[in-house]
Protein backbone atom coordinates (compact mmCIF):
# COMPACT_ATOMS: atom_id res chain seq x y z
CA UNK A 1 0.00 0.00 0.00
CA UNK A 2 2.87 2.33 0.78
CA UNK A 3 4.41 1.73 -2.61
CA UNK A 4 1.08 2.38 -4.25
CA UNK A 5 0.69 5.70 -2.51
CA UNK A 6 4.22 6.71 -3.43
CA UNK A 7 3.65 5.74 -7.03
CA UNK A 8 0.43 7.75 -7.11
CA UNK A 9 2.26 10.72 -5.68
CA UNK A 10 4.87 10.59 -8.39
CA UNK A 11 2.20 10.48 -11.10
CA UNK A 12 0.23 13.40 -9.65
CA UNK A 13 1.82 16.12 -11.77
CA UNK A 14 0.92 14.34 -15.03
CA UNK A 15 -2.37 12.66 -14.17
CA UNK A 16 -5.38 13.26 -16.39
CA UNK A 17 -7.95 12.85 -13.60
CA UNK A 18 -8.09 16.61 -13.06
CA UNK A 19 -7.49 17.70 -16.64
CA UNK A 20 -8.64 21.34 -16.66
CA UNK A 21 -9.44 21.24 -20.37
CA UNK A 22 -11.73 18.24 -20.00
CA UNK A 23 -13.41 19.76 -16.94
CA UNK A 24 -14.01 22.97 -18.85
CA UNK A 25 -15.49 21.14 -21.82
CA UNK A 26 -17.72 19.05 -19.56
CA UNK A 27 -18.91 22.10 -17.65
CA UNK A 28 -19.73 24.03 -20.83
CA UNK A 29 -21.61 21.04 -22.24
CA UNK A 30 -23.55 20.74 -19.00
CA UNK A 31 -24.57 24.40 -19.13
CA UNK A 32 -25.58 24.14 -22.79
CA UNK A 33 -27.73 21.11 -22.04
CA UNK A 34 -29.30 22.81 -19.05
CA UNK A 35 -30.17 25.91 -21.07
CA UNK A 36 -31.51 23.84 -23.97
CA UNK A 37 -33.77 21.87 -21.62
CA UNK A 38 -34.93 25.09 -20.01
CA UNK A 39 -35.82 26.61 -23.39
CA UNK A 40 -37.69 23.45 -24.35
CA UNK A 41 -39.67 23.58 -21.11
CA UNK A 42 -40.57 27.22 -21.70
CA UNK A 43 -41.63 26.43 -25.26
CA UNK A 44 -43.88 23.58 -24.12
CA UNK A 45 -45.35 25.77 -21.39
CA UNK A 46 -46.18 28.51 -23.89
CA UNK A 47 -47.63 26.12 -26.42
CA UNK A 48 -50.00 24.68 -23.81
CA UNK A 49 -51.26 28.07 -22.63
CA UNK A 50 -51.17 30.17 -25.81
CA UNK A 51 -54.04 30.05 -28.27
CA UNK A 52 -53.03 29.54 -31.94
CA UNK A 53 -55.09 32.56 -32.93
CA UNK A 54 -52.91 34.77 -30.73
CA UNK A 55 -49.58 33.36 -31.88
CA UNK A 56 -47.24 35.88 -33.39
CA UNK A 57 -44.82 35.25 -36.28
CA UNK A 58 -41.12 34.69 -35.86
CA UNK A 59 -38.72 37.56 -36.30
CA UNK A 60 -35.62 36.87 -38.35
CA UNK A 61 -32.39 38.56 -37.25
CA UNK A 62 -31.62 41.53 -39.50
CA UNK A 63 -28.07 40.32 -40.06
CA UNK A 64 -27.62 37.14 -42.15
CA UNK A 65 -25.93 35.60 -39.15
CA UNK A 66 -25.05 32.06 -38.28
CA UNK A 67 -27.17 32.19 -35.16
CA UNK A 68 -30.20 29.89 -34.78
CA UNK A 69 -33.63 31.43 -35.44
CA UNK A 70 -34.97 33.40 -32.47
CA UNK A 71 -37.81 32.12 -30.29
CA UNK A 72 -41.41 33.38 -30.75
CA UNK A 73 -41.71 37.05 -29.85
CA UNK A 74 -44.95 37.03 -27.97
CA UNK A 75 -45.99 39.11 -24.99
CA UNK A 76 -45.18 38.20 -21.41
CA UNK A 77 -47.08 35.30 -19.88
CA UNK A 78 -47.33 36.04 -16.18
CA UNK A 79 -50.40 33.86 -15.69
CA UNK A 80 -49.00 30.76 -17.41
CA UNK A 81 -45.68 30.51 -15.57
CA UNK A 82 -45.10 29.42 -12.04
CA UNK A 83 -42.93 31.57 -9.77
CA UNK A 84 -40.08 29.08 -10.15
CA UNK A 85 -40.31 29.29 -13.95
CA UNK A 86 -40.37 33.08 -13.81
CA UNK A 87 -37.33 33.09 -11.53
CA UNK A 88 -35.55 30.66 -13.86
CA UNK A 89 -36.32 32.82 -16.89
CA UNK A 90 -35.10 35.90 -15.03
CA UNK A 91 -31.81 34.19 -14.22
CA UNK A 92 -31.07 33.05 -17.78
CA UNK A 93 -29.49 36.31 -19.01
CA UNK A 94 -27.12 36.30 -16.04
CA UNK A 95 -25.99 32.73 -16.71
CA UNK A 96 -25.52 33.46 -20.40
CA UNK A 97 -23.56 36.65 -19.87
CA UNK A 98 -20.34 34.76 -20.52
CA UNK A 99 -21.56 34.42 -24.11
CA UNK A 100 -20.30 30.81 -24.26
CA UNK A 101 -23.91 29.64 -24.20
CA UNK A 102 -26.52 29.99 -26.96
CA UNK A 103 -28.01 33.48 -27.14
CA UNK A 104 -30.90 34.10 -29.53
CA UNK A 105 -30.98 37.72 -30.83
CA UNK A 106 -34.13 39.52 -29.76
CA UNK A 107 -35.13 43.10 -30.65
CA UNK A 108 -35.48 45.66 -27.83
CA UNK A 109 -39.03 46.31 -26.63
CA UNK A 110 -38.92 48.02 -23.24
CA UNK A 111 -37.97 51.65 -22.78
CA UNK A 112 -34.62 50.93 -21.14
CA UNK A 113 -33.52 48.62 -23.97
CA UNK A 114 -34.59 51.12 -26.62
CA UNK A 115 -32.65 53.86 -24.85
CA UNK A 116 -29.51 51.71 -24.76
CA UNK A 117 -29.98 50.85 -28.44
CA UNK A 118 -30.15 54.54 -29.35
CA UNK A 119 -27.00 55.21 -27.31
CA UNK A 120 -25.00 52.53 -29.12
CA UNK A 121 -26.19 53.78 -32.51
CA UNK A 122 -25.06 57.31 -31.64
CA UNK A 123 -21.68 56.04 -30.43
CA UNK A 124 -21.24 53.94 -33.57
CA UNK A 125 -21.02 57.13 -35.65
CA UNK A 126 -17.73 58.19 -34.00
CA UNK A 127 -15.31 56.13 -36.16
CA UNK A 128 -17.13 57.08 -39.36
CA UNK A 129 -15.89 60.65 -38.87
CA UNK A 130 -12.32 59.43 -39.40
CA UNK A 131 -13.05 58.75 -43.08
CA UNK A 132 -13.04 62.44 -44.04
CA UNK A 133 -10.25 62.79 -46.66
CA UNK A 134 -9.54 66.41 -45.70
CA UNK A 135 -9.23 65.46 -42.04
CA UNK A 136 -6.83 62.61 -42.83
CA UNK A 137 -4.69 64.89 -45.00
CA UNK A 138 -4.54 67.46 -42.21
CA UNK A 139 -3.50 64.76 -39.74
CA UNK A 140 -0.77 63.48 -42.06
CA UNK A 141 0.64 66.99 -42.38
CA UNK A 142 1.15 67.07 -38.59
CA UNK A 143 2.77 63.63 -38.24
CA UNK A 144 6.57 63.39 -38.60
CA UNK A 145 6.33 60.54 -41.09
CA UNK A 146 10.06 60.16 -41.76
CA UNK A 147 10.79 59.87 -38.07
CA UNK A 148 8.04 57.31 -37.43
CA UNK A 149 8.91 55.18 -40.44
CA UNK A 150 12.58 55.19 -39.45
CA UNK A 151 11.78 54.08 -35.90
CA UNK A 152 9.39 51.43 -37.18
CA UNK A 153 11.96 50.07 -39.62
CA UNK A 154 14.58 49.84 -36.90
CA UNK A 155 12.24 48.12 -34.45
CA UNK A 156 10.98 45.74 -37.13
CA UNK A 157 14.52 44.70 -38.07
CA UNK A 158 15.38 44.08 -34.41
CA UNK A 159 12.34 41.85 -34.00
CA UNK A 160 13.17 39.96 -37.18
CA UNK A 161 16.73 39.38 -35.98
CA UNK A 162 15.51 38.17 -32.59
CA UNK A 163 13.03 35.82 -34.26
CA UNK A 164 15.67 34.49 -36.66
CA UNK A 165 18.00 33.69 -33.77
CA UNK A 166 15.45 31.30 -32.26
CA UNK A 167 13.89 30.15 -35.51
CA UNK A 168 10.53 31.76 -34.88
CA UNK A 169 8.26 34.49 -36.20
CA UNK A 170 8.63 38.18 -35.30
CA UNK A 171 6.21 39.25 -32.60
CA UNK A 172 4.95 42.26 -34.58
CA UNK A 173 4.96 43.26 -38.22
CA UNK A 174 6.20 46.49 -39.79
CA UNK A 175 2.77 48.16 -39.77
CA UNK A 176 2.41 47.31 -36.08
CA UNK A 177 5.76 48.97 -35.44
CA UNK A 178 4.53 52.09 -37.27
CA UNK A 179 1.54 52.36 -34.90
CA UNK A 180 3.82 51.76 -31.92
CA UNK A 181 6.07 54.61 -33.07
CA UNK A 182 2.98 56.80 -33.54
CA UNK A 183 1.90 55.95 -29.99
CA UNK A 184 5.21 57.10 -28.53
CA UNK A 185 5.22 60.35 -30.51
CA UNK A 186 1.56 61.12 -29.77
CA UNK A 187 1.94 60.64 -26.01
CA UNK A 188 5.33 62.28 -25.54
CA UNK A 189 5.29 65.10 -28.09
CA UNK A 190 1.87 65.93 -29.51
CA UNK A 191 -1.03 65.69 -27.05
CA UNK A 192 -1.30 67.07 -23.51
CA UNK A 193 -3.34 65.67 -20.63
CA UNK A 194 -5.43 68.27 -18.81
CA UNK A 195 -6.93 67.91 -15.37
CA UNK A 196 -7.45 71.46 -14.09
CA UNK A 197 -6.24 73.87 -16.79
CA UNK A 198 -3.82 76.53 -15.50
CA UNK A 199 -4.86 80.15 -15.45
CA UNK A 200 -4.12 81.71 -18.82
CA UNK A 201 -3.33 85.06 -17.17
CA UNK A 202 -0.93 84.16 -14.33
CA UNK A 203 -0.39 80.40 -14.98
CA UNK A 204 -1.42 79.53 -11.41
CA UNK A 205 -3.53 76.44 -10.63
CA UNK A 206 -7.30 76.74 -10.92
CA UNK A 207 -10.24 75.45 -8.90
CA UNK A 208 -13.24 73.74 -10.50
CA UNK A 209 -16.46 75.75 -10.38
CA UNK A 210 -18.79 73.35 -12.19
CA UNK A 211 -20.28 73.39 -15.67
CA UNK A 212 -21.27 76.37 -17.79
CA UNK A 213 -23.17 76.59 -21.09
CA UNK A 214 -21.00 76.64 -24.23
CA UNK A 215 -20.79 79.82 -26.24
CA UNK A 216 -22.04 79.82 -29.86
CA UNK A 217 -18.45 79.66 -31.06
CA UNK A 218 -17.65 76.70 -28.79
CA UNK A 219 -20.80 74.93 -29.96
CA UNK A 220 -19.83 75.48 -33.58
CA UNK A 221 -16.45 73.90 -32.84
CA UNK A 222 -18.09 70.77 -31.43
CA UNK A 223 -18.08 71.47 -27.69
CA UNK A 224 -20.89 69.52 -26.05
CA UNK A 225 -20.13 70.85 -22.55
CA UNK A 226 -17.80 73.38 -20.94
CA UNK A 227 -16.10 73.17 -17.54
CA UNK A 228 -15.49 76.40 -15.61
CA UNK A 229 -12.45 77.00 -13.38
CA UNK A 230 -11.42 79.94 -11.17
CA UNK A 231 -7.83 80.99 -10.55
CA UNK A 232 -6.59 80.00 -7.08
CA UNK A 233 -4.60 83.23 -6.78
CA UNK A 234 -6.77 85.69 -4.84
CA UNK A 235 -5.22 88.72 -6.51
CA UNK A 236 -6.09 87.33 -9.95
CA UNK A 237 -9.51 85.73 -9.65
CA UNK A 238 -9.93 85.24 -13.39
CA UNK A 239 -11.96 82.37 -14.82
CA UNK A 240 -10.79 79.70 -17.23
CA UNK A 241 -13.09 77.82 -19.60
CA UNK A 242 -12.32 74.25 -20.65
CA UNK A 243 -14.52 73.19 -23.60
CA UNK A 244 -14.80 69.41 -24.04
CA UNK A 245 -14.49 69.09 -27.79
CA UNK A 246 -15.64 65.96 -29.59
CA UNK A 247 -14.79 67.26 -33.06
CA UNK A 248 -11.46 65.83 -34.22
CA UNK A 249 -10.73 68.90 -36.36
CA UNK A 250 -10.71 71.05 -33.24
CA UNK A 251 -8.60 68.54 -31.31
CA UNK A 252 -5.89 68.90 -33.94
CA UNK A 253 -5.74 72.58 -32.97
CA UNK A 254 -6.15 72.41 -29.18
CA UNK A 255 -4.03 69.24 -28.73
CA UNK A 256 -5.17 68.77 -25.16
CA UNK A 257 -7.84 66.99 -23.21
CA UNK A 258 -8.61 63.98 -21.11
CA UNK A 259 -9.08 60.33 -21.96
CA UNK A 260 -11.95 60.96 -24.37
CA UNK A 261 -10.04 63.51 -26.42
CA UNK A 262 -6.90 61.36 -26.40
CA UNK A 263 -8.65 58.25 -27.70
CA UNK A 264 -10.63 60.18 -30.31
CA UNK A 265 -7.66 62.02 -31.77
CA UNK A 266 -5.25 59.08 -31.62
CA UNK A 267 -7.73 56.74 -33.31
CA UNK A 268 -8.01 59.20 -36.19
CA UNK A 269 -4.20 59.38 -36.47
CA UNK A 270 -4.04 55.58 -36.71
CA UNK A 271 -6.57 55.72 -39.52
CA UNK A 272 -4.53 58.39 -41.28
CA UNK A 273 -1.55 56.00 -41.31
CA UNK A 274 -3.65 53.34 -43.00
CA UNK A 275 -4.52 51.24 -39.98
CA UNK A 276 -7.85 49.57 -39.33
CA UNK A 277 -9.18 51.23 -36.21
CA UNK A 278 -11.76 50.62 -33.52
CA UNK A 279 -12.93 53.20 -31.00
CA UNK A 280 -13.77 51.26 -27.82
CA UNK A 281 -16.42 52.60 -25.46
CA UNK A 282 -16.66 51.42 -21.86
CA UNK A 283 -19.85 52.02 -19.89
CA UNK A 284 -17.79 52.96 -16.81
CA UNK A 285 -16.87 56.24 -18.56
CA UNK A 286 -13.62 55.28 -20.23
CA UNK A 287 -12.52 54.90 -23.86
CA UNK A 288 -9.50 53.57 -25.76
CA UNK A 289 -8.42 52.29 -29.18
CA UNK A 290 -7.99 48.97 -30.93
CA UNK A 291 -5.95 48.51 -34.10
CA UNK A 292 -5.96 45.44 -36.29
CA UNK A 293 -2.66 43.59 -36.63
CA UNK A 294 -2.42 41.87 -40.00
CA UNK A 295 0.70 40.15 -38.69
CA UNK A 296 -1.11 38.49 -35.77
CA UNK A 297 -4.57 38.53 -37.39
CA UNK A 298 -6.25 39.98 -34.32
CA UNK A 299 -7.31 43.27 -32.77
CA UNK A 300 -4.75 44.86 -30.43
CA UNK A 301 -5.55 47.06 -27.45
CA UNK A 302 -3.93 50.53 -27.52
CA UNK A 303 -4.38 53.21 -24.84
CA UNK A 304 -2.77 56.45 -26.01
CA UNK A 305 -3.31 58.19 -22.69
CA UNK A 306 -1.33 55.48 -20.87
CA UNK A 307 1.07 54.68 -23.68
CA UNK A 308 -0.12 51.08 -23.37
CA UNK A 309 0.18 48.57 -26.21
CA UNK A 310 -1.56 45.18 -26.09
CA UNK A 311 -2.38 45.35 -22.37
CA UNK A 312 -6.10 44.45 -22.28
CA UNK A 313 -5.95 43.40 -18.61
CA UNK A 314 -4.59 46.78 -17.51
CA UNK A 315 -7.93 48.16 -16.31
CA UNK A 316 -9.14 45.11 -14.37
CA UNK A 317 -6.10 43.24 -13.08
CA UNK A 318 -3.89 46.33 -13.11
CA UNK A 319 -6.14 49.06 -11.75
CA UNK A 320 -8.65 46.79 -10.04
CA UNK A 321 -11.59 48.26 -11.97
CA UNK A 322 -14.85 46.42 -12.56
CA UNK A 323 -16.18 46.69 -16.12
CA UNK A 324 -19.59 45.78 -17.49
CA UNK A 325 -19.74 46.72 -21.19
CA UNK A 326 -16.83 47.25 -23.59
CA UNK A 327 -18.17 47.84 -27.11
CA UNK A 328 -15.80 48.39 -30.05
CA UNK A 329 -17.02 50.51 -32.97
CA UNK A 330 -15.49 50.75 -36.43
CA UNK A 331 -16.55 51.54 -39.98
CA UNK A 332 -17.31 47.81 -40.29
CA UNK A 333 -19.79 47.65 -37.42
CA UNK A 334 -19.69 46.93 -33.70
CA UNK A 335 -18.45 44.12 -31.47
CA UNK A 336 -18.89 43.33 -27.79
CA UNK A 337 -15.26 42.90 -26.71
CA UNK A 338 -15.88 42.78 -22.96
CA UNK A 339 -14.39 39.30 -22.68
CA UNK A 340 -11.05 40.61 -23.95
CA UNK A 341 -10.80 43.05 -21.04
CA UNK A 342 -12.68 41.15 -18.32
CA UNK A 343 -11.03 37.74 -18.11
CA UNK A 344 -12.65 36.88 -14.78
CA UNK A 345 -16.29 38.10 -14.66
CA UNK A 346 -16.57 37.02 -11.03
CA UNK A 347 -13.63 39.17 -9.89
CA UNK A 348 -13.67 42.05 -12.36
CA UNK A 349 -17.08 42.04 -14.01
CA UNK A 350 -19.70 44.66 -13.13
CA UNK A 351 -23.41 43.84 -13.51
CA UNK A 352 -24.55 43.77 -17.15
CA UNK A 353 -28.11 44.93 -16.54
CA UNK A 354 -28.59 47.66 -19.14
CA UNK A 355 -30.24 45.21 -21.54
CA UNK A 356 -30.71 41.43 -21.75
CA UNK A 357 -27.86 39.66 -23.52
CA UNK A 358 -30.06 38.58 -26.43
CA UNK A 359 -31.06 42.22 -27.01
CA UNK A 360 -27.43 43.33 -27.01
CA UNK A 361 -26.60 40.71 -29.65
CA UNK A 362 -29.51 41.98 -31.76
CA UNK A 363 -28.26 45.58 -31.51
CA UNK A 364 -24.71 44.53 -32.45
CA UNK A 365 -26.04 42.68 -35.51
CA UNK A 366 -28.16 45.70 -36.43
CA UNK A 367 -25.17 48.05 -36.39
CA UNK A 368 -23.09 45.58 -38.39
CA UNK A 369 -25.77 45.26 -41.03
CA UNK A 370 -26.06 49.03 -41.30
CA UNK A 371 -22.31 49.46 -41.83
CA UNK A 372 -21.87 46.52 -44.20
CA UNK A 373 -24.97 46.60 -46.37
CA UNK A 374 -23.24 48.63 -49.09
CA UNK A 375 -20.13 46.42 -49.13
CA UNK A 376 -19.38 43.80 -51.74
CA UNK A 377 -20.18 40.17 -51.03
CA UNK A 378 -16.47 39.44 -50.90
CA UNK A 379 -15.87 42.01 -48.17
CA UNK A 380 -18.91 40.82 -46.24
CA UNK A 381 -17.67 37.23 -46.29
CA UNK A 382 -14.20 38.37 -45.23
CA UNK A 383 -15.59 40.30 -42.28
CA UNK A 384 -17.84 37.40 -41.31
CA UNK A 385 -14.85 35.06 -41.16
CA UNK A 386 -13.00 37.68 -39.14
CA UNK A 387 -15.94 37.86 -36.72
CA UNK A 388 -15.86 34.08 -36.33
CA UNK A 389 -12.13 34.11 -35.65
CA UNK A 390 -12.50 36.84 -33.03
CA UNK A 391 -15.43 35.05 -31.39
CA UNK A 392 -13.24 31.97 -31.07
CA UNK A 393 -10.53 34.12 -29.49
CA UNK A 394 -12.94 35.66 -26.98
CA UNK A 395 -14.38 32.27 -26.06
CA UNK A 396 -10.87 30.98 -25.46
CA UNK A 397 -10.35 33.73 -22.87
CA UNK A 398 -13.43 32.61 -20.97
CA UNK A 399 -12.52 28.93 -21.23
CA UNK A 400 -9.02 29.67 -19.94
CA UNK A 401 -10.38 31.68 -17.01
CA UNK A 402 -12.86 28.93 -16.18
CA UNK A 403 -10.16 26.28 -16.36
CA UNK A 404 -7.99 28.32 -14.01
CA UNK A 405 -10.85 28.66 -11.51
CA UNK A 406 -11.54 24.93 -11.63
CA UNK A 407 -7.85 24.18 -11.30
CA UNK A 408 -7.66 26.35 -8.18
CA UNK A 409 -10.46 24.32 -6.61
CA UNK A 410 -8.52 21.07 -6.94
CA UNK A 411 -6.75 20.09 -3.68
CA UNK A 412 -2.99 20.32 -4.03
CA UNK A 413 -1.11 17.15 -3.10
CA UNK A 414 2.48 17.13 -2.05
CA UNK A 415 4.66 15.98 -4.90
CA UNK A 416 7.74 13.87 -4.59
CA UNK A 417 10.69 15.92 -3.42
CA UNK A 418 11.96 17.35 -0.21
CA UNK A 419 9.80 16.61 2.83
CA UNK A 420 7.37 19.40 3.58
CA UNK A 421 8.10 21.18 0.30
CA UNK A 422 5.00 22.68 -1.34
CA UNK A 423 4.60 24.54 -4.57
CA UNK A 424 3.24 28.07 -4.57
CA UNK A 425 -0.40 28.11 -5.76
CA UNK A 426 -0.82 29.34 -9.31
CA UNK A 427 -3.06 32.16 -8.15
CA UNK A 428 -0.20 33.57 -6.07
CA UNK A 429 2.52 33.31 -8.67
CA UNK A 430 1.41 36.18 -10.85
CA UNK A 431 -0.30 39.03 -9.04
CA UNK A 432 -1.96 41.89 -10.93
CA UNK A 433 0.81 44.26 -9.85
CA UNK A 434 3.48 41.89 -11.15
CA UNK A 435 1.60 41.46 -14.41
CA UNK A 436 1.27 45.19 -15.03
CA UNK A 437 4.93 45.73 -14.21
CA UNK A 438 5.87 43.03 -16.70
CA UNK A 439 3.69 44.62 -19.37
CA UNK A 440 5.18 48.09 -18.99
CA UNK A 441 7.38 47.99 -22.05
CA UNK A 442 7.77 49.37 -25.53
CA UNK A 443 5.74 52.49 -26.29
CA UNK A 444 5.56 53.86 -22.73
CA UNK A 445 4.83 53.29 -19.10
CA UNK A 446 1.35 52.72 -17.79
CA UNK A 447 0.50 55.52 -15.44
CA UNK A 448 -2.06 55.87 -12.66
CA UNK A 449 -5.71 54.99 -13.00
CA UNK A 450 -7.21 57.89 -14.97
CA UNK A 451 -10.67 56.36 -15.17
CA UNK A 452 -11.77 58.41 -12.17
CA UNK A 453 -11.05 61.57 -14.15
CA UNK A 454 -13.82 60.72 -16.60
CA UNK A 455 -13.78 61.07 -20.33
UniProtKB/Swiss-Prot annotation:
Q: Which species is this record about? A: Aspergillus fumigatus (strain ATCC MYA-4609 / CBS 101355 / FGSC A1100 / Af293) (Neosartorya fumigata)
Region (Disordered) residue ranges read: 1-110, 408-455
Q: Which GO terms describe its biological process?
A: glycoprotein catabolic process
Where do Pro residues bias regions lie? 59-73
Q: Where is the composition biased (Low complexity)?
A: 38-53, 74-98
Q: Which domain of life is it from?
A: Eukaryota
Assigned protein family: Belongs to the transglutaminase-like superfamily. PNGase family.
Record keywords: Zinc included? yes
Its Gene Ontology molecular function terms?
metal ion binding; peptide-N4-(N-acetyl-beta-glucosaminyl)asparagine amidase activity
Give the matching Gene3D superfamilies. Answer: 2.20.25.10, 3.10.620.30
Q: Which key words are in the record?
A: Metal-binding, Zinc
Q: Which residues bind Zn(2+)?
A: 199, 202, 231, 236
- Sorted alphabetically, which SMART domains does this protein's record hold? TGc
What GO CC annotations are associated with the protein? cytosol; nucleus
Q: What is this protein called?
A: Protein png1
Amino acid sequence: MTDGRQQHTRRAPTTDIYDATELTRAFEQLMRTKRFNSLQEQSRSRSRTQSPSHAQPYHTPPHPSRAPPPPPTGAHYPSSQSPSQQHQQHQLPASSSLRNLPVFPSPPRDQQSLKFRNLLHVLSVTPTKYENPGLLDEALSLIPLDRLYSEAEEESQIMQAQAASVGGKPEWGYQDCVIRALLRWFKNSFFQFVNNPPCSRCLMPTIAQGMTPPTPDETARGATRVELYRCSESTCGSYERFPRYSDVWQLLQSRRGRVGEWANCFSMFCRALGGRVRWVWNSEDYVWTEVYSEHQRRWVHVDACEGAWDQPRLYTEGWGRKLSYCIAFSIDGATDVTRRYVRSPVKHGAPRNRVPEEVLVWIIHEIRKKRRESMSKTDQRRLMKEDEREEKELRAYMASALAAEINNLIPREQTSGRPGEQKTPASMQDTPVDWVAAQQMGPGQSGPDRSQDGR
